[in-house]
Amino acid sequence: MMEPVIQALVDEDAFGLVEIARLEWHKFEAQGPAAIAEEFAKWGKPDFVRLHLDHIPVIDEDNLKVDYLPIIKEAIGLGYQSVMIDGSRLNLDENIAATKEVVALAHAAGIPCEAELGAVLGHESGPPPPYEQLFASGQGFTDVGEAKRFVAETGCDWLSVAVGNIHGAVSGALKDHKKVEARLHIEHLRKLHEATNVPLVLHGGSGVQRSYLLEATRNGMTKVNIGTEIRQAYEQELRDSSVISKAQQSCYQRTRWLLKDYFGLSGTRRQVFGGAL
């Protein structure tokens, strides 16, 4: 799906990141970091897109320990242009320690590091709790005080936060289901941004109500991950027609629609680079 996504960015004159997470090759049978880097070298256009290593957990969705450092080191060696360490299932002190180590590796290579604090649910086995219950209780929301300390002590460049967002399932019985139409707690997001003063990241962007997404971008949310919606467009067409080129076209059209009509990002690429391109 990489080629149609990148072509959509070019045709809409927008900027984005192509991402691969451990979960996708571990459970979803996607290609691993080396194969993705090779494909990106073929299709990538540096004025429009960068390659990001997403969600490398210390403890995974099955509560198993992950040998995460070799994965991150491999990606850096392969030329990935940013990386993410996910220590969100650790306690705060452990998350800080793990993240700080990866930040040092990334910065030594001259690239930014994303980290996560709070519980962005959706990748766990089995059905999640009712969404309205989660949102009303603030279960898993990133704590403002902890976020301030976390950023100060780790030096992370981007922080993934939990403010009502949930991941889409990428494996199992739920992976083809339409995502819950999530909301975002904008006031909580604003407080997080004021406390941390770093770009915040929204994981689980597919299915979030548009009004909340747009308001979030005005309150510190700088990077929005969209995976489920693009993947499902590709897979649905592949099931219907069994023709890869048609599935790629469906992926391309969905990505262009997201860029142009949903987010209004057409023609904004130069803003990312301060008008330098």
Regions found by a protein language model. Name each.
Residues 238-277:
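Extended, intrinsically disordered, low-complexity segments
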Residues 52, 114-116, 201, 258:
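Generic enzyme active-site microenvironment
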Residues 1-24, 31-48, 59-196, 210-221, ...:
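Alpha/beta enzyme core
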Residues 223-242, 253:
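Shared catalytic-loop signature of beta/alpha-barrel
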Residues 27, 179, 245, 249:
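Charge-dense, low-complexity intrinsically disordered segments
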Residues 52-59, 199-210:
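Glycine-rich beta-to-alpha transition loops that act as phosphate-gripper elements at the mouths
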Residues 27-28, 53-58, 266, 270-271, ...:
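Metal-cofactor-binding active-site regions of metalloenzymes
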